[in-house]
């Protein structure tokens, strides 16, 4: 049996496909890849906030829906909280480090005033503004290699990236891992997901064999939190769950740059229920602070 995988054509995306493919080969399944151009690729200089939702996934998922591929592979943080009803999560593989990192000569608390940090994420910009209001942020687009090249050529004094991207691309560069209480990561950061057609039972069964259960539970809990509060890759909300045994440890944060709210939860149970509880806690605090009605 051979699985046809749709994915973006970027270097990072191809590495992620091969990570999934390696798991498939271990159970005797071969794979091929179809490279898909997405809106994010076609408008690579536009700020992500202007491109709308689903810019990294829409065209890739359409290839699966149209039968051009069996499954789609994504960085899970890039897929919308509400997946197309004809699609389903077939698998996630074991999570890479979920943290944000700062690539700069000094750590965040020691950076010089008026330092310029490259990031296009509203969440990251707001966390920086809250922690170090005298530091500047500037939009940056392009793949990871391009961003690092811009940093090394002094276009930026620093960058904020996902640690997982550096690890997957095997990039050797010094960085500072950001504390999750200062910089709560985006939901599902560090997770690679496989989406497939809901009715395709044969392919679905294959991917059940490579799913990492604890990672899936963490992913579902984080998505439940975001579903309650409202958010996505253009949202200033961070959420992270870690599962140890039967216990879930979760943290969620919101910042508008002037104030910051952080809530946490620790309990055993169903990931959806626990994630929803954390979302309700954050929503309650946001109402108390007058951020939402």
Swiss-Prot record:
Binds 1 dipyrromethane group covalently. Tetrapolymerization of the monopyrrole PBG into the hydroxymethylbilane pre-uroporphyrinogen in several discrete steps. GO terms for cellular component: cytoplasm. GO terms for biological process: heme biosynthetic process; protoporphyrinogen IX biosynthetic process. Disulfide bonds: none annotated. It holds the Pfam family Porphobil_deamC. This is Probable porphobilinogen deaminase. It catalyses: 4 porphobilinogen + H2O = hydroxymethylbilane + 4 NH4(+). InterPro entries: HemC, Porphobilin_deaminase_cofac_BS, Porphobilin_deaminase_N, Porphobilinogen_deaminase_C, Porphobilinogen_deaminase_C_sf. Belongs to the HMBS family. PROSITE patterns: PORPHOBILINOGEN_DEAM (PS00533). The gene is hemC. The porphobilinogen subunits are added to the dipyrromethane group. GO terms for molecular function: hydroxymethylbilane synthase activity. The modification S-(dipyrrolylmethanemethyl)cysteine is found at residue 233. Pathway: Porphyrin-containing compound metabolism; protoporphyrin-IX biosynthesis; coproporphyrinogen-III from 5-aminolevulinate: step 2/4. Its EC number is 2.5.1.61. Its cofactor is dipyrromethane. Keywords: Porphyrin biosynthesis, Transferase. Coiled coil: none annotated.
């Amino acid at each position: 049996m051979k699985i046809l995988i749709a994915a973006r054509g970027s270097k990072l995306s191809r590495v992620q496909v091969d990570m999934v493919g390696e798991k498939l080969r271990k159970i005797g399944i071969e794979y091929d890849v179809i490279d898909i151009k997405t809106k994010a690729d076609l408008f690579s200089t536009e700020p992500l906030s202007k491109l709308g939702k689903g810019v990294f996934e829409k065209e890739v998922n359409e290839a699966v829906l149209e039968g051009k591929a069996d499954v789609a592979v994504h960085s899970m943080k890039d897929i919308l909280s509400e997946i197309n009803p004809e699609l389903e999560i077939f698998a996630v593989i074991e999570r890479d480090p979920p943290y944000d990192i700062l690539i700069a000569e000094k750590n965040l608390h020691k950076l010089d005033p008026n330092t310029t940090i490259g990031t296009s994420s509203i969440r990251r910009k707001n966390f920086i503004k809250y922690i170090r209001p005298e530091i500047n942020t500037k939009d940056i687009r392009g793949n990871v290699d391009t961003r690092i090249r811009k940093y090394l050529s002094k276009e930026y004094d620093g960058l904020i990236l996902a640690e997982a991207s550096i690890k997957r691309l095997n990039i050797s560069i010094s960085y500072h891992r950001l504390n999750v209480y200062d910089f709560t990561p985006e939901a599902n950061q560090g997770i690679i997901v496989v989406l497939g057609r809901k009715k395709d039972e044969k392919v679905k069964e294959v991917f059940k064999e490579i799913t990492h259960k604890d990672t899936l539970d963490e992913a579902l809990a984080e998505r439940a939190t975001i579903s309650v509060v409202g958010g996505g890759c253009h949202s200033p909300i961070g959420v992270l769950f870690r599962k140890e045994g039967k216990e879930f440890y979760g943290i969620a944060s919101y910042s508008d740059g002037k104030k910051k709210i952080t809530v946490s939860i620790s309990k055993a149970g169903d990931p959806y229920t626990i994630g929803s509880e954390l979302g309700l806690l954050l929503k309650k605090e946001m109402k108390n602070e007058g951020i939402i009605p």
